UniProtKB/Swiss-Prot annotation:
This is RuvB-like helicase 2. SMART domains: AAA. GO terms for molecular function: ATP binding; ATP hydrolysis activity; DNA helicase activity. DNA helicase which participates in several chromatin remodeling complexes, including the SWR1 and the INO80 complexes. The SWR1 complex mediates the ATP-dependent exchange of histone H2A for the H2A variant HZT1 leading to transcriptional regulation of selected genes by chromatin remodeling. The INO80 complex remodels chromatin by shifting nucleosomes and is involved in DNA repair. Also involved in pre-rRNA processing. The lineage of its organism: Eukaryota, Fungi, Dikarya, Ascomycota, Saccharomycotina. Its EC number is 3.6.4.12. GO terms for biological process: box C/D snoRNP assembly; chromatin remodeling; DNA repair; regulation of transcription by RNA polymerase II; rRNA processing. Its main location: nucleus. Gene3D superfamilies: 1.10.8.60, P-loop containing nucleotide triphosphate hydrolases (3.40.50.300), RuvB-like helicase, domain II (2.40.50.360).
Length: 466
């Protein structure tokens, strides 16, 4: 079984959206330590929870933990998802990280266990080592001979290093590949002899001229040294799910691009597990346990929890991080209550990291970070009242008022958000407590029995003068 992966970097400058946790770049730890800073990498407060998450993160990096589960438990707006995102950012791109919401597994196309199985296998990476022969050097000249009758194109490629220079004959496929990569004289390229794939490494420093019109993405590199033909060890990191899809006869590798993978037969997975085990014994591959993050885990039912119990005991199991904001809650699919809405046998297998509500000072720091992320300038008075609102209502509500207040400030041609903008936004948009108060004083809404008292005027108007 041969597996080839092609890494491509694309410029996505046009997509500049600010998400709820886009300001988080890590767990905010001290260098070469597991001690979290008070305010770093977008993380504020929750020192004990971040310290515990740092221990889990270090064990994941060392590869000493697999098949374990961690539960982040705490009230709403206490940074549970933020801690999981911080772990994801700290791991880097080489360790698989799959994020899943508890309600995502309910689908008409996939069974619950199949959706969970795919999520588990997406979170397990296989680092495959492959030795390939490559030709690496600076292009001196490209000659292409085109037939007048429209036949096959032929050509010659002159390529050199600092020690030698060689001329290669080109077929029509290699000529097309050079044209697609826009290779010209002076470029440093790498050619895979087995597949014929051409990789453009950059432009030679010898061709760097002040008057050349070059793009911002042009990279200058040194001309390679030594032999033209070299043998290099290439490392590909793919997930078990990607190998499943590629080897599924009903879907094929095209399903990787469409996303419509469908059900994958257990026989295919067993064959792949056997093959990966052989690669591991031969030293060709290495298993990389990743992380599966399940948010709102209390939305799963007993069938899903039973599957997770079995999957955690498998040889190739990722680290499962779960988050919930429930206390004593009914387990879905049953009539009995349990802590955090999870069955007792699963709770026995998890280590629980608690999170606590933020202090007003921490709320203020988080709101300032969010304002900087959204490029909103807040006046000191506006920041103080937003802090008071966030501490009294919820951090999410206070964070949502930032963009609304910024829009109101732009309407009055102000450069920064002022106190009156926040007050205006607060009067226009209700928080949970004021919404409940309004509902309790109103009789015009449709009740549970489907009836409503229409046409009656409210006795007390809602107070929006705050």
């Amino acid at each position: 079984m041969s597996i080839a992966t092609v890494a491509q970097a694309k410029d996505v400058r046009g997509l500049n959206l600010v998400a709820a946790h886009s300001h988080i770049t890590g767990l905010g730890l001290e260098p070469n330590s597991l001690t979290p800073k008070e305010n770093a990498q977008g993380m504020v407060g929750q020192v004990k929870a971040r310290r515990a998450a740092a221990v889990v993160l270090q064990m994941i990096k060392d590869g000493k933990i697999a098949g374990r589960s961690v539960l982040l438990a705490g009230p709403p707006s206490t940074g549970k998802t933020a801690i999981a995102m911080g772990i994801s950012q700290s791991l880097g791109s080489d360790v698989p990280f799959t994020s899943l919401a508890g309600s995502e597994i309910y689908s008409l196309e996939l069974s619950k266990t199949e959706a969970l199985n795919q999520a588990f296998r997406k979170s397990i990476g296989v680092r495959i080592k492959e030795t390939t022969d490559i030709i690496e050097g600076e292009v001196v000249e490209i000659q292409i001979d085109r037939s007048l009758s429209g036949g096959h194109k032929q050509g010659k490629l002159t390529i050199k290093t600092t020690d030698m220079e060689t001329i290669y004959d080109l077929g029509h496929k290699m000529i097309d590949s050079l044209s697609n990569e826009k290779v010209t004289a002076g470029d440093v390229i790498s050619i895979d002899k087995a597949s014929g794939r051409i990789t453009k490494l950059g432009r030679s420093f010898a061709r760097a001229r002040d008057y050349d019109a070059l793009g911002a993405d042009t990279k200058f590199v040194q001309c390679p040294e030594g032999e033209l033909q070299q043998r290099k060890e290439v490392i590909h990191t793919v997930s078990l799910h990607e190998i499943d899809v590629i080897n599924s006869r009903s879907q094929g590798f095209l399903a990787l691009f469409s996303g419509d993978t469908g059900e994958i037969r257990p026989e295919v997975r067993e064959q792949i597990n056997t093959k990966v085990a052989e690669w591991k014994e031969e030293g060709k591959a290495e298993i990389v346990p990743g992380v599966l993050f399940i948010d709102e885990v209390h939305m799963l039912d007993m069938e899903c929890f039973s599957f997770i119990n079995r999957a955690l005991e498998d040889d190739m199991a990722p680290i499962v991080i779960m988050a919930t904001n429930r206390g004593q809650s009914t387990t879905r699919g049953t009539d009995y209550k349990s802590p955090h809405g999870l069955p007792v046998d699963l709770l026995d297998r998890v280590i629980i990291i608690p999170t606590s509500p933020y202090s007003p000072d921490e709320v203020k720091q988080i709101l300032q970070i969010r304002a900087n992320e959204e490029e909103v300038e807040l006046s000191p008075e506006a920041l103080e009242i937003l802090t008071s609102i966030g501490a009294d209502t919820s951090l999410r509500y206070g964070s949502n008022l930032i963009s609304v207040s910024h829009m109101l400030a732009q309407k009055r041609k102000a450069s920064s958000v002022g106190l009156e903008d926040v007050k205006r936004a607060y009067s226009l948009f209700l928080d949970t407590a004021r919404s409940v108060q309004f509902l309790s004083s109103s009789n015009n809404y449709v009740g549970e029995d489907g009836t409503a008292k229409l046409g009656e005027r409210e006795k007390d108007a809602m107070d929006t003068s705050a």
